[in-house]
Amino acid sequence: FRTDGQELEIRQHDPYNRGLLWPQRFAVTLCGERDSVIRVNMTDTLFRMQLPFVPSRVLPNTDGRGYGVFVPDEPALHWLAAHWWEIEDDTARQSLLMVLYENYLAKHISADDWVNSLITGLPAEKNALVASTASGYLANVMREIAPANRAEVEARIYTMTQNHPLPSCRIQLMRLFMQNAISEPMVKKLYILWQQQSDKHLNRQDYTTLAYELAIRMPLESEQI
């Protein structure tokens, strides 16, 4: 995606250079003095369109109907990573979260920037489907973050397991937390949780899984566990 004044340019590229084309229709949101949605009918590798105004950013595939990796221009990508949770429409927010994930996989977003985007936006998410999607993405990126940032990330995830407004999200976050927490303070919290079995949302299998995880992380207490 590229804009030049009031002109929008979209290019489609086959990453394997097979000359394939994917005709498709999808919505694009133009942000600026007044947000506007346009419909794109992509029938060739290049699409150009005159816009009604000069947008501050262009957000691709906001209706979720398109397929493939949508790569916004750099300013739009940075804005999305810092503000995706502010998008009011649930469908657009879910679709653009997927756009961010695909750009993370394509190495356009670093693991640390991606995890920071997720743990910043997730506490505000009220839609169960979007929250579940964000939590799943968080589980995928946990092992990739820099060791120096690990303890802080784990602490912020633990906070969400205690106070996120959606019970389903709290459970999902707790399960990923049990599988991924390695910092000493957070492992101690998991040990206390296993001892007291105080989280009534977790079932017997969850606590059995937690026992196995703790036995690996706390080898000196493994026999007791």
Could you describe each region identified by the protein language model?
Residues 1-225:
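Non-catalytic accessory/interaction domains
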